[in-house]
């Protein structure tokens, strides 16, 4: 329907889909076939962390991906990352040919001791790697704000809560792309409206975002992004993110 070069297509190699090096190419070819394309613009080693990185090394997943790039079946090889900055430093040192890194990056996690958004971003910059941003609105947490936090942003010049969160992330040097999960046409139109003629946050907006940070931290809310990975492995199929959201909402109601 549209020329292939007119859109960017990304896929990922998840560790659960291969047990040995020989499994990777057939799986990759099945991904191309499923998408009906001859190549992927980006191919990411999925969810790299201390728990699975060695599996990728043992199965020569990176070497296979680099070979696929040499064959023209992948334009850029990268990783999506979910761990501490020191682990990212090790991976980029081990594999300097990695071209792009996808990290969780938003204003609430910027200095979070567990997520380490800022530190991971700084590692990417030191290694000269462009960044793909995931979770810029933290699974909707930075859209569905507590009333007092929403009031801070409402006092600005009319942007949506999502707009301030996404512009915060996109305003840093080296950000190649900001991935925003959208579930309605209205959300897409909102994103397009402020990214078409992009402007980073000004000083007043940044101060407001910092105030929202302070409000969130004062409430001690559960830092769930609603990625739902936990539900996939739950033997009872419990909707864990919904329960955590309900718990946070109840705590917020009691504090009013």
Predicted regions and their residues:
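N-terminal binding-site loop/beta-alpha segment at the start of enzyme catalytic domains
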Residues: 1-7, 38, 64, 70
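Acidic (Asp/Glu)-rich catalytic clusters
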Residues: 2-4, 32-36, 91-96
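A short, structured active-site edge motif that brings together acidic residues
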Residues: 6-17, 43-48
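Glycine-rich anion/phosphate-binding loops
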Residues: 18-26
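Beta/alpha (TIM)-barrel catalytic core signal, keyed to glycine-rich beta->alpha loops juxtaposed to Asp/Glu
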Residues: 48-223, 229-238
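Iron-sulfur (Fe-S) cluster-binding segments and ferredoxin-like electron-carrier domains
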Residues: 236-247
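Single conserved hydrophobic/aromatic residue that forms the stacking wall/gate
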Residues: 245-256
